[in-house]
Amino acid sequence: MNDRADALLSNFSDRVAARHEGETEYLQAVTEIARDVLTIEKANSAYTKARILERLTEADRIISFSVIWEDDAGQVQINRGWRVQHSNLLGPYKGGLRWVRDLSPSVLKFLAFEQAFKNALTGMPLGAAKGGADFDPSGRSDAEIRRFATAFMTQLAAHIGPDTDVPAGDIGVGSQEIGVMARVWMQHARRWGGVLTGKPVALGGSAMRAEATGYGLLYFTAAMLDAEGETLKGKRIALSGRGNVSRFAARKAIEQGACVVTMSGRKGTWHAPDGFSPQALDWLVAAEGDSAYSPPKALELTFEEGTRPWGVPCDIALPCATQNEIGLEDAKTLADAGCRYLAEGANMPVTQDAIAHLARAGVLQAPGKAANAGGVAVSGLEMQQNAGFSRWSAAQVDGCLREIMCTIHDRLTSERRSCCTQTGAVDYRRAANVAAYRRLAEAMIAAG
């Protein structure tokens, strides 16, 4: 950045930080966007006059509520719930619900802000929101989770609707919980409606929802490689996590002829030197408890306790586990081991210093707001199916998903002129921020 850009960023960051003191995750996300788009805003008099980016940093509203429910022992439990309705410039508020013990409004604000840019990139009529509760479903019985879900939706129901705010699942909230909450909303509203996405198919959910983020990640990665004259075939992929995103990304990678060499969990890494076979992947997905740490020898898979998935030589890194999982040392390891591409399956999984090091090393990096947009894309397709009282086949949904992810890639490459690396390749991180910002800015100007 030049001195003028540095000054713009410093002044802007100071103003935002004064209003959001101590909200580390949120300020990190805002700073990343601001670094890329402030000079564009200042070069456009209409954008400058409307103070587009500063307005985009403020959520429309934050809804806070208590969730009172009873556990199996008959004891009253009290949790807190939130819904950050960030922006409905482009369509109904849209974003997931997560139930995590230490959830905070700061994390939800960061996720909702990121969601606004991710949803804008899809080209679909989707606003942005995020919500959840400081509830940990692990160790809770099915009955307790149902009672909590019922109490949570009873409080949230008045604030959402098919044309207002359409939540989805996220960490701790799967299709079963979405199904319970959808039914509670219908009873509250006294009508049927596609008010939540990620529903069980029997309740109006879409085919391919579970696969969407992982498959979409591979479709975007394949488009990146194609732009460089390469394919996935034979590429070594280091993957983190073993949840839905990871397992379906691994499945699609194997299907495309790539060699998935790692997956990971809290205690360490599963390493397949010659690549996961479909059988090894199925075994790992199904394995429960401590049995997962002792793979059968026939699978040619080992578990390495206390290790991270980034120490294995690879061509492509796909971080799919959690925020800030790749730090500077991990980035150095990846670059030194020959990694040339990175695409984010998780939200903000790479720290700023790691991003900078990978960029200096010439690693092409696709941010989560573009690369993991498959989940929200299929959520949007579920909304279309619900609104039209129709149901699409898995093949139809998959075809639409592939098209959306390739269109997102094309949208980013169209920003090449102002968003390129020193070698002339597309700077995907900056291009994603710029392309999404332009769509949101034009909508804000049009709205007056």
Regions found by a protein language model. Name each.
Residues V100, N119-K233:
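Glycine/serine-rich phosphate-binding loop and adjoining beta1-alpha1 elements at the start
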Residues G268-Q365, A370:
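Rossmann-like adenosine-cofactor binding region
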